[in-house]
Amino acid sequence: MLEWKDNVILLSSKPFGESGIIASVLSEKNGRYKGFVFGGNSKKKRATFQKGNLCTAHWKSRTSEQLGSLKIELIKSTAPNIMDQPIQLSALSSVCDVFDFILPEREPNRKLFNATIKLFELLKLSDSINYSWVKGYINWELGVLSELGFSLKLNKCAVNNDCKNLAFVSPKTGRAVSYDIGLPYKNKLFILPKFLGGNYYQDNIHEDILNGLIITKFFINMNFFKNSHLPSSRIRLQKQLEDKLSKV
């Protein structure tokens, strides 16, 4: 018998059978796992299986090839704390949906687990006026890219190693480009936000945030969703922020 007990983040749940569900979770010590939850679709337990909830889980299976079963108990809900903040709710859904698609099964990554818990706490502390949490979300996406082998190099120019006059990011290499080098090709490059090390084009903090979202969306889509579709929650998040910040 194989089994583990651990803290988990609930990524998704799908009805299975009369009252059960298939739950997908990110475990702190064991990585992403799926398992069958008996009675998980009952009215009594439905609130436990909301995306982003922090829970304790007990997974068991006779063999490593089997799906296994999960017993899950709620520790702390996430979504109810931001129910009146639709953009933050989209961010929460985006995190869970992206992870549910791209994370390899049963490969531990405590760093991503901890980073996600911190991001959810940041979402709960945010409000409809302060959008500084979006920087945290962008850095979370950069961390995901890095942990899964697609790190962006934003600390120096890919051509001349300049560290002080960075202005762009190459979509081909994921590396920073200095202002002088990149200026003739600026229409083919991304603008590097100030909070990620850029020194130009940051007259508007809201534009800075949107430029960061454009960069991470592009590289996540290119590296993980080339043969699929970016989750609708991630697309919705970007559209909501574009609409909101363009009016501020």
Task: Put a short name on every predicted segment.
Residues M1-I21, L26-V248:
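Non-catalytic alpha-helical scaffolds and adjoining flexible linkers that form interface surfaces
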